[in-house]
Curated annotation (Swiss-Prot):
Homodimer. Catalyzes the phosphorylation of a wide range of nucleosides to yield nucleoside monophosphates. Shows the highest activity for inosine, guanosine and cytidine, but very poor kinase activity with adenosine, thymidine, uridine and xanthosine. ATP is the best phosphate donor, but can also use ITP and GTP. Shows extremely low activity with fructose-6-phosphate. Can use Mg(2+) and Mn(2+) with equal efficiency in vitro, and to a lesser extent, Ni(2+). Optimum pH is 7.0. 50% of activity is found at pH 6.1 and 8.2. It is an enzyme of class 2 (transferase). PROSITE patterns: PFKB_KINASES_1 (PS00583), PFKB_KINASES_2 (PS00584). The record marks 250 as: Transition state stabilizer. It catalyses: cytidine + ATP = CMP + ADP + H(+); guanosine + ATP = GMP + ADP + H(+); inosine + ATP = IMP + ADP + H(+). Pfam families: PfkB. This is Nucleoside kinase. ATP binds at residues 109, 186, 214-219. Its EC number is 2.7.1.213, 2.7.1.73. Optimum temperature is 85 degrees Celsius. Thermostable.
Length: 302
């Protein structure tokens, strides 16, 4: 698949993030001061698509955005990165989805998400996917399921329910997992999904080729039918903001996969990519190039 052809389609949210660092979360009916606040480009699908492109792999984005998207600077930014945005749906009456993300001193997070233009996913039908991988991130569960069913068998389907996991019914979650090759979850989502489905590890592996569970500073684990691969956390210079670490891990993992690496190396590339992102505020602020990722892995003698 040479040339300009996009290798990976990312389906799901493109959003504007407002990120706040607080000492601790306030109690109900109280207020706290916030030292600073800034707007960043975010949304799980967009974060992953940008991360993939920065690593030298062509990506495209399938998202619903609002009437404010063109003037937000985000559209121009994606075009300048040469990410294919021809599959964006523009709403004329709703604004681009927005997230207000609060992080405490222990890196716990609370997020308030404005759905906005994302309500239009229900009206859309999935396009034909002409890429090697279709990565389905946070977004509308019904549309995500449609995309997984359309892509499965023709494309490798990667699925990361993220913080939208509670919006999936048991039946819907099971059906999308049955149309997934690579299933990504963090440890909290993995516990929630396993409780909802009453699943053990083996139950997932009867349905997917690989289950990848990320555990923050404790690294990640890749489960396949044959083995369990422990991936260490790659140390960052200094952890400033954990927002977007998961999306960048997935970007690194999938980019390495389309470059032909085995799953262990994919996990290491994912972990190293995430180690850069946490060094700055914002999901896309400090996304590394492929060379920088490889250099950091070599520095850790991995």
């Amino acid at each position: 698949m040479g040339g300009k052809m996009e290798k990976i389609t990312c389906v799901g949210h493109t959003a504007l993030d407002y990120i706040f660092n607080v000492e601790k979360f306030p109690e109900p009916n109280t207020s706290i001061q916030i030292p600073s606040a800034r707007k960043y480009y975010g949304g799980a699908a967009a974060n992953t698509a940008v991360g993939i492109k920065k690593l030298g792999v062509n990506s495209e984005l399938l998202s619903c955005v609002g009437y404010d998207f063109k003037n937000s600077g985000y559209e121009r930014y994606l075009k300048n990165l040469d990410i294919n945005i021809s599959k964006l749906y523009y709403s004329e009456e709703e604004e681009t989805p927005k997230a207000w993300i609060f992080t405490d001193k222990d890196n716990n997070q609370i997020t308030f998400f404005l759905w906005g233009a994302a309500k239009h996913y229900k009206e859309l039908n999935p396009p034909n996917f002409n890429t090697e991988i279709v990565h389905i991130a946070t977004g509308d569960p019904e549309f995500n399921l449609k995309c997984a069913k359309k892509a499965y068998g023709n494309n490798l389907v990667s699925f990361d329910p993220g913080q939208d996991l509670p919006q999936y019914s048991k039946e819907m979650l099971l059906e999308i997992i049955e149309h997934t090759n690579f299933l990504f979850m963090n440890k909290h989502e993995f516990e929630r999904a396993s409780n909802l489905l009453n699943f053990e590890i083996d139950d997932y592996l009867e349905r997917v080729d690989a289950l990848i569970v990320t555990k923050g500073s404790k690294g990640s684990v890749i489960y396949t039918k044959d083995k369990k691969i422990e991936i260490p956390c790659i140390k960052a210079g200094k952890v400033i903001d954990p927002t977007g670490a998961g999306d960048s891990y997935r970007a690194g993992f999938l980019s390495a996969y389309v470059k032909g690496y085995d799953l262990e190396k994919c996990g290491l590339i994912g972990a190293a990519t995430a180690s850069f992102v946490v060094e700055a505020k914002g999901c896309q602020t400090n996304l590394p190039t492929w060379d920088k990722v490889v250099e950091r892995l070599e520095k850790h003698r991995i």
